From Swiss-Prot:
Gene3D superfamilies in UniProt: 1.20.120.1220
Keyword vocabulary terms for this entry: Cell inner membrane, Cell membrane, Hydrolase, Membrane, Metal-binding, Methyltransferase, Multifunctional enzyme, Protease, S-adenosyl-L-methionine, Transferase, Transmembrane, Transmembrane helix, Zinc
Annotated InterPro entries: Peptidase_A24A_bac, Prepilin_IV_endopep_pep, Prepilin_pept_A24_N, Prepilin_peptidase/N-MTase
Keyword Protein transport tagged: no
Family matches, as Pfam families: A24_N_bact, Peptidase_A24
Lineage of the organism: Bacteria, Pseudomonadati, Pseudomonadota, Gammaproteobacteria, Pseudomonadales
Catalysed transformations (reactions): Typically cleaves a -Gly-|-Phe- bond to release an N-terminal, basic peptide of 5-8 residues from type IV prepilin, and then N-methylates the new N-terminal amino group, the methyl donor being S-adenosyl-L-methionine
Any GO BP: methylation
Enzyme Commission designation: 3.4.23.43, 2.1.1.-
Membrane disposition: Multi-pass membrane protein
Family per record: Belongs to the peptidase A24 family.
Name the record gives this protein: Prepilin leader peptidase/N-methyltransferase
């Protein structure tokens, strides 16, 4: 009996394995969410300086691997045992071992969130090809949501590989036939692109960024054109609810910019996982 056969026969072990893997990936996503925007900003500055003929400032190596993680308050280099997902945070009681300043609770929350999402995928699909390819999509959408929330940025470095991966996956018909995936990517991009320009023509303002177009194209590449209506509906409802909360509870102004990427990511993830069931339930309620 192979390991894969064993995991397929014993779903609990696969779910546990996916959950632990989600914790580890969540720890890495914390690094990606913090460092990738800085890396991109430095790259853009360097390219702008080169185009303008200005001196280029050379920085020390800064990527997803180096320098080693350190405390943002005192610069204490985080040791291996201090970097264990969730457990280290609990052992340190949420404080740096050197300066005793509080560590942001967001770090363990991201790790736990990634673990829970991975667990849901494993529970939904079991030990299958669908689960194996959907886990990277889930992690990518989580990273994109956090970066967009923090920086109002959806990096091509994550979006474009995710889009191509969706097309490759559906080349083998994992979710939908390849023509549906290609159509989903094209229609996903053009639908928000059209909304963007109509809004800009009417108001003279930009209602969303180009990253949102590409993110919806990514979701269309994975789930086909069939997931787009549900994704747009759910993301619009989520965005509207959060917008009302920000206006009524936090007293934000109408002009406060609000990233749309997280709502697209949440809605698209739901649509890819449960879109067929949601459509079937709605048709049944309508008597079709």
């Amino acid at each position: 009996m192979t390991l894969w056969t064993f995991l397929a026969m014993e779903p609990a072990y696969f779910i546990t394995l996916a959950t632990v893997l989600g914790l580890l990936v969540g720890s890495f996503l914390n690094v990606v969410v913090y460092r990738l925007p800085i890396m991109l900003e430095r790259q853009w500055q360097r390219e702008a300086h080169e185009v303008l003929g200005l001196p280029v400032t050379e920085h020390e190596r800064f990527d997803l691997c180096l320098p080693a993680s350190q405390c943002t308050q005192c610069g204490h280099r985080i040791r291996a045992w201090e970097n264990l997902p969730v457990l280290s945070y609990l052992a340190l009681r949420g404080r740096c071992s050197a300066c005793k300043q509080r560590i942001s609770v967001r770090y363990p929350l991201v790790e736990v969130g990634c673990a829970l999402l991975s667990m849901v995928v494993a529970w939904r699909y079991g030990a299958s090809v669908e689960a194996l390819v959907l886990l990277p999509l889930t992690w990518s959408l989580l990273a994109l949501s956090l970066i967009d929330h923090d920086q109002q940025l959806l990096p091509d470095a994550i979006v474009l590989p995710g889009l191509w991966l969706g097309l490759i996956v559906n080349y083998f018909g994992v979710w939908v036939p390849l023509p549906d995936a290609v159509c989903g990517a094209v229609v996903g991009y053009l639908s928000l692109w059209t909304v963007y320009w109509l809004f800009k023509l009417v108001t003279g303002k930009e209602g969303m960024g180009y990253g949102d177009f590409k993110l919806l194209a990514l979701l269309g590449a994975w789930g086909g054109w069939q997931v787009l209506p549900l994704t747009l509906l759910l993301s619009s409802v989520l965005g509207a609810l959060v917008g009302v909360y920000l206006l009524r509870v936090r007293n934000d102004s109408m002009g406060t910019a609000m990233p749309f990427g997280p709502y697209l990511a949440i809605a698209g993830w739901i649509a890819v996982l449960w879109g067929d069931e949601i459509y079937a339930s709605n048709m049944q309620l309508l008597g079709f």
